[in-house]
């Protein structure tokens, strides 16, 4: 079954790049802006209540998780009220130890058991929304009064319905490129807003 990327593919690189960018524009127009507002408001609330924000993801989404955490933590470090944001995707020793000893499905949930506290926030980033290690981490968080939010694509998978909040990127199945592109831009957008929000407070 063909998806939109298959349909716009052309051996003419100029045409493909033009149509790819046009498809990204279409996706952006169909994202619910209220869900982005909800995420920003939630992150600010967690900071104001001295709570931690944890980002999790696999593959390209792990890179987005790291970038997101970096932007809002390091980007606000010089101000009075920075964000306590952490990516649980970054420590190779921890990830490989947990994966080796407990299985890949446990690499995030076991970190949350060690670090996360009541009313913290876990943000899961996933194109499919079905990664078992993310689902397990979100289930644990929900059961332990840790707030949850997800960025998803495709049909939203399990995460879309499991998390307390969600930003859904409306792509077709297996369109990883556009899904991860838009997730990264959302991360940049949220980070840009939060940095300026903190600047305005100072």
What spans do the regions from the language model cover?
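Glycine-rich phosphate-binding loops that contact phosphosugars or nucleotide phosphates
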Residues: 61-201
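Generic N-terminal amphipathic, Lys/Arg-enriched alpha-helix
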Residues: 1-31
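A short, well-structured juxtamembrane/interface segment
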Residues: 29-49
